[in-house]
Amino acid sequence: MYQAIIFSSAAVISALVLLLCRKHENCRHNILKALTVIFCTVGFVRFFLSDSITYIINGGWFEGVRYEQTDFFNVILRWGYYTNYAVLTTAVFTKNRFFRNMAGYFSLPFSILSAVYYEDFMKYFLDPTGKGYHLTPEFRYAFFAAELALAIMIPIILHVGDRHVFNFKDAKEWVAYFLGVPAVLLVMTPVYATPSFLGTNNLAPQWFSPYHLIWIGATFVIALIIYYIFRFQSFEVRHSVCLFFVLVLFFHYNSLYLMGLTLKRLPFQLCNFAAYTFLAAFILKSKKLFHYGFIANIVGTMFAILVPDFGIGYTGFWNMHFLFEHSLVLIVPAICMGLQIFPRLSKRSMGYYFVGFSIYITFCYILGTIER
C-alpha cells in the first residue's frame, strides 16, 4: 500500500509542478528548492529516530556483544540513498552537470529501489533494539513514505523541467560520471557500512600505527587532489564542489544521532560545531562566519588528527565516524579557501579565533562536553 502511495504522490506532485510552472521557470526552481529543503529537513529529523542498522555487523564485536548478522542488500540500498542528501541539494542549487547527471541516473534509481524495498527499511526502523526515538509504527511508515516521495519527485522535476539529459556524445561527461560517482560514494560512506562489509574487532588502533598514518596521508592527499582537479574550473563548478563537501560534512555529523541523542553528541564540541558553521557560512555567504569556523576548529582538528581518540574496532562505527568527521573538518575549509570560494585568512581574521575558542570553552564548561 505504501509503495503505491509513494509512487502516485511523486507522480501527481511532479506533474502538477511541471504543468503549473511550465511557462514560469523561476516558479519551478523556487518550488524545487523548497522541496529539496523539506527533503533534507525530513532526512535530518529521521536521524534522530530509532534505527537498528548499526547492529548489522559482518562478524564482529560491538559494545561487548558479538554479531554475526549481515544484510548487505539493505546497506547497499542505504548507501546509494544516502547520497541523495548532498547530491540532490547540490544539483538543485547549482547547475553542475555532474551532480545533475548523478541525481537523475544514480540517486533516482536508488530512491525508486528504496521505495520498492520499503519494508526492508521499516524492519530496522521499528526494531525495539534500535537507538533514537521510538515513535508509533503509523508515523514511521508515513514519515519515511513522504521522504521517499520527495526523493523521487525532485530529480524528475529537475530533469524534465530543465530538459536535462546526459550528453552521451561527450567523452568528458562519461569520464566525469564514472570517476565522480565512486568518489561521491567514497566520501559519503555511511559509518555503518564498513562493519557491515568488513566486520570489526576488539582491537583499538594505536597512535602513528600504519592505520593512523594511512588516515593522515589519505586526508591530505584527498584535499590536494580536489584542489588540483578543480583549481582552474569555473566559479560555478568550484562552488558546487565545495557546497557538496559542506553538505557531506553536515549530514555525516548528524548521522551520529543514529546512536541516540545525548548531551555529549550535541554540536558544542568544535569539530561537531563546524558542520553547522560551514553550512551557515555558505547559506549566508559570510566570510567572517567561515573564518570564525575555520580558526576556531583548526587547533582541535589538528590535535584530533595527530593525537586521535581511537575507540575499539578498526572499522567500527565510532572509529569510522571519528576518521570521516575530522578529515572532512580539515578538507572542507582547505578546499573552500584553496578554490577561492572564501578568501584566505588575513591577520585581522585571527581575532575570530579568540572569540570562537572562548565560546567553545564556555559551552564546554557549562554543558560538560569537554569529555567525549
What does each of the following model-derived ranges do?
Residues 20-35, 91-103, 161-172, 229-241, ...:
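Membrane-interface helix-boundary motifs at transmembrane edges
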Residues 118-200, 341-372:
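C-terminal membrane-adjacent module
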Residues 310-355:
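A contiguous pocket-lining binding segment that forms or flanks enzyme active sites
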Residues 6-18, 77-91, 142-160, 214-227, ...:
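Hydrophobic cores of alpha-helical transmembrane segments in multi-pass inner/ER membrane proteins
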Residues 40-48, 106-120, 181-190, 247-257, ...:
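Aromatic-anchored segments of alpha-helical transmembrane domains
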Residues 35-72, 234-279:
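A glycine-rich, hydrophobic loop/mini-helix early in the fold
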Residues 121, 134, 257-265, 284-288, ...:
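Membrane-interface helix caps and helix-loop-helix hairpins in membrane proteins
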Residues 1, 63-79, 131-145, 204-214, ...:
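Short aromatic-rich membrane-water interface segments that cap or initiate transmembrane helices
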